Structures are given as C-alpha cells and as structure tokens.
Amino acid sequence: MAHSAASGAASAAHFEKKTPEVAHEEKKPPLPEEEDEDEDMDALIEELESQDGHIDIEDDEDGEPGGARPVPDELLTTDTRHGLTDAEVVARRKKYGLNQMKEEKENLVLKFLSYFVGPIQFVMEAAAILAAGLEDWVDFGVICALLLLNACVGFVQEFQAGSIVDELKKTLALKAVVLRNGRLTEVEAPEVVPGDILQVEEGTIIPADGRIVTEEAFLQVDQSAITGESLAVDKHKGDTCYASSAVKRGEAFMVITATGDNTFVGRGPALVNAASAGTGHFTEVLNGIGTVLLILVILTLLVVWVSSFYRSNSIVTILEFTLAITIIGVPVGLPAVVTTTMAVGAAYLAKKKAIVQKLSAIESLAGVEILCSDKTGTLTKNKLSLAEPYCVSGVDPEDLMLTACLAASRKKKGIDAIDKAFLKSLRYYPRAKSVLTQYKVLEFHPFDPVSKKVSAVVLSPQGERITCVKGAPLSVLKTVEEDHPIPDEVDSAYKNKVAEFATRGFRSLGVARKRGEGSWEILGIMPCSDPPRHDTAKTINEAKTLGLSIKMLTGDAVGIARETSRQLGLGTNVYNAERLGLGGGGTMPGSEVYDFVEAADGFAEVFPQHKYNVVEILQQRGYLVAMTGDGVNDAPSLKKADTGIAVEGASDAARSAADIVFLAPGLSAIIDALKTSRQIFHRMYAYVVYRIALSLHLEIFLGLWIAILNTSLNLQLVVFIAIFADIATLAIAYDNAPFSKTPVKWNLPKLWGMSVLLGIVLAVGTWITLTTMLVGSENGGIVQNFGRTHPVLFLEISLTENWLIFITRANGPFWSSIPSWQLSGAILLVDIIATLFTIFGWFVGGQTSIVAVVRIWVFSFGCFCVLGGLYYLLQGSAGFDNMMHGKSPKKNQKQRSLEDFVVSLQRVSTQHEKSS
C-alpha cells in the first residue's frame, strides 16, 4: 500500500497530526444555510481570488481588428493585468457607441396598420367598399368602425402585455466580466468597449468580437449561431471569437476588437433577426380557419347568386345580399382576439416569473405530455451539504478536504454548488482552512462533462507542484488506475463505499492527487447530498393528475438517481443512459430502445447527447416534449424539445436556446406555468369554436332565407350582429378559464365538427323563430306578439350567439365554471343594447312589445340549454372524436422496422467516428 503511505506522509508534511476520530466528530451535523456562513465564505474566496495564479495572461499581439469600422491597433494594446481605466472606457464608448446592434425600432404606425392586413381583414375591407358603392353610409361607417375597433384593442393589449414582458426580460440581459482599473468587474454586455479585457468561461455567451490573449488557452466555442456548424471549435491564443458564440469548455481572457454593428454578426442583418419571436402553430391554425370560412362564404354566395338570377333580382338587391353574407361569414375579430389572448397570457406568466421568449411557447407548453427534467435545482434544492468522508487507510480527512478545495474555483461569481459546499464545510476542517490560502493555483481546469472531473495544478508553500483532482468516483479511480495498479482490497473497499453511498442517496466525489512527477494517490470519497425540495413530491403528484409524465435525466450515478426518484414518487425504473446503446454499442433493437425510453422513469449518468436522443425518441413516438436545462451543454436538447425551459440560474447559452426562462426555482413554478398555459389555450380554443359556429349560423340561415324566401335581414342589423359578436368576446382574454386535466392540442377535425353542429342548431333555432312569425294573425305568430320580423330576429340571434361563449368556455356543463366579471359584464351589456334595439325599433322603425321580448328571451334560453347539452355530449364523446378525427394508430410493424433501422444507422455512424 505504497500510495497510502505516501498519502500519510504528505499529510504529516502539511498539517499537524490530527486523529481521524476527532475530525469525524466535528463533521457530522449538516451545515445550516446562514448568512454569516455565506459572508465568511465570500471573504475566503476574495482572499483566494487575490492570489489567482491561473489567470496569468499575456499581452496581446497585434492582429486584424474585427469590424467594418476598424479599431486602431494602439487601442488594442491594453495592459492585460490592469485593463482599461474608467476614463478610457468613457472615451471609447463615446467614439464607438454601446455594444449593441442598431435595432430597427418598430414603427408603431406600421404596427397599427398591420392589424388591417390579412385575408379576413381584406374581406371586410371589400365589404366596406361594397357598402360605399351601394351608398349605404351607415353600414360603411359601422364596418370601418368595426375594423378600427379590432385594430385598436389588439394594438393596445399587445403593446401593454409586451411592455410587461420586456421589463422582466431586462433582468435576463447578458452580463460580461471585464478587467478594469486592475479589478474584475461585471457589467452589462452593452457596456463593453473595444480594448476591454474580457473574461470568458464555460457557459459564457461572448458579447463582442475579440482575440484570445491568455497563454496556452484552450477554449471550445459553439459557433453554430453564426456558421451552422454543430461541433464546437477549438480556440487558442491569437484566435478570434465572435459575438453570440457560446463557450462550451475552458476559460481565458480576450481583448475586445469590435463591438455592436462592427462585429461579424453585426454586419449580417439576417443573423441578427434569426431569433425571431415566432407565433407558432396557432397562426397556421387561424390562417387555415380563415381560408375555410372564405371558401364557405363563396359557396354560400354562389347559392345566393344562382337563386337571385333565377328570380331576376336587381343588381342592387344581389349586391345587398352579397354584402350581408360577406359581413357575417368572416369573423373580423378572430386574429385580434386570439393574439390579445396570447399576449395577455404572456404578461400574466411574466408576473409569475416565467418569461415567454415567443408566444408560440404558450401553445406548445399547454400540449406537453412528457417533461424531461434535470434533477439538481429543479427536483432538488441545489444546496449541497457534505457528510462524513470515507478516507483510504492512512489518509487524514483534513488532507482529503484540502485537496478537494484546491481543485475548486477561486471566483466568487459563477462558483458552482459543489465548490460552494466544500468551501462552506471548511469551518469543520480548521487546519485545511488555515493553509488553503498559502497555495498558489498555476492551472485550473473546470468541470469537464466528458471526463467528469475538475482538476487544478497548485504550488505548495514548500514549492512543490501538486495536481489535485475531484469528480465522479469511478472516473477519479480510473485516473489512478491508468497510472499504476491499485491493491484489490483498496479498490474493492472504494467501490463498495461508492455503492453504499449511492443506496443512501448520496452523491459521491472521489479525490486524488499527484505530487510532482510522482504517482497518483487515491485519497478517498466525500459524500454530499442535495435533498429534494419540500414541494417536489406534492408537485409531481399534481403533475400526474394533469396527465404529465416526468422523466428525470441526471448525470448522477444510477443508485443516487434511483433513490432520489423513489423519494419523489417518480418510480424506480431509472437506468444508466449507456443502456440506450446510442453511443455505438448495445444490441437492443431500435423499436425496443424506443419502448425502453417510453417506459423508463429516468436515466442516470447522462451526457448532453443522451438528453438530445431521449427527446428525439419521444418526439418520434408522437409525444410533445418539454426539456429543462441550465448549462451550455443543455442548449441542443433545449432547442430540440417542443418547449425548451431554462431553469432559475441557467447559463446565458441555455437561456438563449430556451422558449421559456424561469426566474423562480423548482418544479412547482413549471407546473404552475403549465396550468396557466392550458388556461390560455382553452380561452383561444373556446373562442375559435364559438366564432366559427357564429359564422356558420348566419351563413346557413341567411343563405336559406334568401334562397327560399328571396329576402334577408336588414343590412344595418347584420352589421351590428357582427359588432356585438366581437365586442362581447374581447373580454375572453381575462376570463376565469378552467385548465384541462390532460394535455391540450388543436384537434381541428373535432373543432370543426362541434362548430358545424352548433352552427346548425343555432340556424334551426333562428329558422323556428322566423317561421313562427310567418303564420297566425297579422300581428305575428307564436313567438311574436306584435312588431316587425327584423328586430325580433335580431334579438334572437344576438342572445343565442352571445350566450354560446358561456358554453364553449366550460370544460363540462356550462354552470361548472363561473365566468369572469369582465366577460359576464360585456355579454350583459350587449344583451341590453340588443334588447333596446328591438323594443324601440332602432334603424328599422316600429316598436316591439315587452311581451314579445320576454318570449324571445325565454325561447333563446331554451336554445341555449339545447346547445349546452349538445356541446357537453360532443366534448366528452370518444365516438364523436373517432368519427371526426380518429385516434393515433397503434405502432405497426412498419413503424417498428423503421425505428430499428434508424437506431442501427446511429450505432454504425458512431462506431465509424470512433474508428476514424
């Protein structure tokens, strides 16, 4: 046991001898999270920072400036140990401006005018022109007012909601760490100027073009946003790094050579606009609905024209019929109401600390069926505490702790949770703490997700060069084994301890070191725990009731992951990600790999590629998948997922790739946002069903009335019906919508089926009203007591159409969900106005009795009940859904063969890459 003896000797050389028993006694209690501890740790880090031996950067060399507006070479010769002074920063900012692209400020006039553009708006504008041609100035004015009203409401609501989101987005602004006045300072990215000495490290989004000036620097930089190249590019001293690139590995200093529009990206406007806030699938849905409704309008007009020509109607009469059908057949408020609903929803989510990067994320989050969640910080507290260490025979725990802390970051900003836990635990290791600051760090290599280790080369007070390593226990053990054989009893005891810690839910970190040119020494294992958040188990149960399946993806060992999953109630089907066999190995057929992923509760020891593959497999099985992440290596899977979620504290790269950025910690924030997104989606869905049914209602009724009886409803009343339909439902964006207990999607066949049937029932109710007024005494028939046909029909149409929204907005019977006061008030106001129209005979002359009005209200309520019963039956009918849409077919043999083929190709491709 030569290595043990050496370790013991080393301990004696650096520490006064302390018995392991005493050391263990002091470390058993968990560490409290108190402010004074954080202050003590910050003071220690500041002391360590002042001795940063690993930031030994050299003066930069002359090189080509990186911008369309060249920066003189003399401005790029900044002292790399002192940086710029405040006066130099001010002068350069005055000359070169802020480090930001010149944004084309959105022209508010053009933005407002955009609400008059679109297929539906064009039809209404054509209707206005037609009304002007008929010299029907009342209809012309009302149609124009309707277009203007929808534009104003949509513009104001979206502007207000956008302002709320923009305010919170400012908190996500990129930061930069620069060397100024001899000190590292964090500034906003736009404040960087040419000649600044910029510090970059893993996870940094580079804010401006620059050239690396650190000797022996090694960075891996993701330039996919610029070049489209998926693999990271290696960078060394003298190489240029471009703005918007992400550092995936390493750390270095660089001198800024170009900022703002003078950067490589700034000279390519198309790249600047690459990250547009798309509106997603719902825009396609609206366009499709608008197109179908236009086709139905045209078909109805053909019927009307044929019947009119057959009766030799005048051209003016035909144009009046055309105008009536056009106005009622196209829902002019549809785009504005849906966009407003989404924008208001985004603002509401922002208040709940969920920043929506693009509106389409709301829709996709509402439909998510599987959430692939990382463990640390989302399911757990991300507050590690250390337990009693396992030391190899002859090793002092103080020695183990000192080595582990030497292999830790010495920067206050960006220090990870593991290093923070070790530094906090130094209060239990006074001797290690007392000598830690006497060591000078020569090299520091941050955590490498491939080797799963972090290492540092330090210089001891005695001048000895020591290499310290901590990381995944088996990876550290492998490092020692590659240097020299480890005695079987030590190897066995070490591995057994790793397994024991894992079964107890501890995450283990192996610690080893090498003195000078000597052999590697294995020192022991430090167990740490990251307990589940207090609300995680409850939230997971709630997620299950919402039809959401959660799969845990973690880099921890299988035992730890399985124990954590068991504690949280996720299940124990947690496997090593290598079993996927997508890394060039494995014999499982492709279809079985897909089944395996589908059935698993989670995967452990995952690499970024595993996360990407899991998301891809689930998507190919037809699931909508959300993925959480926080690191730069999570960016590919965040982009691949239907909804990429950057959790609290995520790196700039992860935030840039995500669809939604959370400022609040934990799974509960995500589930709250999911419920809210389902509410928003439900509002949109309810309004779309409602609005299609209204259009079909009057197309069917007026088409039949004109074709059979050669007459139509008064044009002014038709226009007011269209106005009332839109005004009443503008408040849908603020409705107390219920959220679905299952993931929601645009089931368009079922949506159209329900809308058509509701439209037919509405048309039948209106036809009954019409026909009962055509019989009986000269004062009217069964429904009408006395008065005119047009006002009575107007009231019946207005009431039944307005009340329909109370039916479509509910997830069950219409009485199961109470609407908001805004929606109820808007509907009531419109009903009162429609009633006054009828009583006083506005626009058509002739009054209608109160008795007739009461009869219409009673009859309309009867229609409302029939509609409510029909919608409730259709909504929950699997048979109707199968008839209209059909369920997804079961995976057939052809599908499984394709999956086998795809996985085989992936394995062959990976094996080829390894062999080459």
Swiss-Prot record:
The plasma membrane ATPase of plants and fungi is a hydrogen ion pump. The proton gradient it generates drives the active transport of nutrients by H(+)-symport. The resulting external acidification and/or internal alkinization may mediate growth responses. The active site is at D374. PANTHER family: CALCIUM-TRANSPORTING ATPASE. Residues 14-31 have a biased composition (Basic and acidic residues). Keywords: ATP-binding, Cell membrane, Hydrogen ion transport, Ion transport, Magnesium, Membrane, Metal-binding, Nucleotide-binding, Phosphoprotein, Translocase, Transmembrane, Transmembrane helix, Transport. It catalyses: ATP + H2O + H(+)(in) = ADP + phosphate + 2 H(+)(out). GO terms for cellular component: plasma membrane. InterPro entries: ATPase_P-typ_cation-transptr_N, ATPase_P-typ_cyto_dom_N, ATPase_P-typ_P_site, ATPase_P-typ_TM_dom_sf, ATPase_P-typ_transduc_dom_A_sf, HAD-like_sf, HAD_sf, P-type_ATPase_IIIA. Mg(2+) binds at D630, D634. This is Plasma membrane ATPase. It comes from Ajellomyces capsulatus. The keyword Metal-binding applies. Its main location: membrane. The gene is PMA1. Pfam families: Cation_ATPase_N, E1-E2_ATPase, Hydrolase. Its EC number is 7.1.2.1. Belongs to the cation transport ATPase (P-type) (TC 3.A.3) family. Type IIIA subfamily. Residues 1-82 are annotated as: Disordered.
